[in-house]
Amino acid sequence: MKTPTIPTLLGPDGMTSLREYAGYHGGGSGFGGQLRAWNPPGESVDAALLPNFTRGNARADDLVRNNGYAANAIQLHQDHIVGSFFRLSHRPSWRYLGIGEEEARAFSREVEAAWKEFAEDDCCCIDVERKRTFTMMIREGVAMHAFNGELFVQATWDTSPSRLFRTQFRMVSPKRISNPNNTGDSRNCRAGVQINDSGAALGYYVSEDGYPGWMPQKWTWIPRELPGGRASFIHVFEPVEDGQTRGANVFYSVMEQMKMLDTLQNTQLQSAIVKAMYAVTIESELDTQSAMDFILGANSKEQRDKLTGWIGEIAAYYAAAPVRLGGAKVPHLMPGDSLNLQTAQDTDNGYSVFEQSLLRYIAAGLGVSYEQLSRNYAQMSYSTARASANESWAHFMGRRKFVASRQASQMFLCWLEEAIVRRVVTLPSKARFSFQEARSAWGNCDWIGSGRMAIDGLKEVQEAVMLIEAGLSTYEKECAKRGDDYQEIFAQQVRETMERRAAGLKPPAWAAAAFESGLRQSTEEEKSDSRAA
């Protein structure tokens, strides 16, 4: 007696077993076998990034230099993350340090005043090259991180006795970080970064700028930290998984599309120029046999002579009877020729829609909105514009916290150590820890950059006032959203109030009345919109 055969249940494709088909499709061949030829290797970040690291960054550099959309993406990062002034808001951890809150506030005011004098000096003493203020260095760092995936800053010491502070910083291009003598990567030296067995960076190999190529390339090893804990070389990037040594630039996911879009735009422009260049064409009759003789016999001297003679006859005829469109005379054409007027044609042919689709894809990869990347705000309502701005704002705030603020805080700590040693600022006497014992606690701070873009100024102010009145926010947070320091605003308001009183001016009561009127009008509009909905 034969054992009955149990039929195998198959999936929708009729080939894959149902048991296999019920699993994750991404690891299989896919419906109809679409994924069968897609077999990428499983690699670590360094294995995927470092072999073509130099070429990838060079391509990103070329995009930023020669592609308008790429340059705009970098500009958006600089303007929305940093802005025109990257303001320090020093807030030491006074509870941990064992000092009073008022002592901490007094110390912070002293530190902020000294820091601003040092960092934003027009003489650019903070920069080794004497080209940048502190805000300019942060803007450069954000741009460097965007199109190179990382930023480097070297903390140096000025030996000149003419300045109060000797601390200086040098912006270092990621192109200069490489293995000495351009050797291959090893377990403890990858792409110019010396690491220990745990993957922590110990130092960096920095090559000298050899332009214009008249001197041999040399490398200098710079430690990450000095023995006392002071930062010597600042390296900021966002790793995506463990074991990553260098940063990946933001253009990797959209680099191919951006290059092809650039080529497409140039081709479209050339096509439009060609179509607009020729207003009239003269078509000459040539029988098939003669045409094939000219084409196939192009290497024959006899055929070349025949072709030259034929073209010469045409040129001689039209030299005697030139074709002109601006004159009143209607010319006689050579027998067999026809005069065709070329009308202007639509050069778009669906190009704009295709370009928008590509730009939306590119904007998603770069973390900005399509409207910001393309500078096209047409056909947008307030709600759409606000949602788009909020999405980009969340991305920019993450970059401000983990890129710009990290660079700024490490630079600030280097300066604060010297300021304390030189007694430019004085630590509170009752502090539990010294600066060397609690660097992070003494240097704890926030950084205020550019404010959030206001779509409707009145509604945004009303929202801020309501949040403060409801206890859901503070003046500090709302002013920071606008790129301002609430303490500076309060101090300025006190000065202005005293000056108005001294001048015999009344408080601007009309401002409060106008605000209440606008608030009532906005509420009525929202109620009418809800009724209509």
Briefly describe each language-model feature range:
Residues 122, 128, 328-455, 516:
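Surface-exposed loop-to-helix/strand elements on domain peripheries
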Residues 109-120, 132, 139-147, 151-154, ...:
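A broad, structural surface signal
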Residues 1-102, 531-533:
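N-terminal-proximal low-complexity accessory segments that begin disordered
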Residues 76-239, 467:
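Structured, mid-chain assembly/scaffold modules that mediate subunit interfaces
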Residues 233-388, 431:
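Extended, charged amphipathic alpha-helical segments
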Residues 39, 132-138, 155-172, 287-300, ...:
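Charge-rich, acidic-biased intrinsically disordered regions
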Residues 124, 147, 151, 242, ...:
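Intrinsically disordered or highly flexible coil/loop and linker segments, enriched in small
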Residues 2-4, 337-348, 390, 458-533:
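Activation/maturation switch segments at domain boundaries
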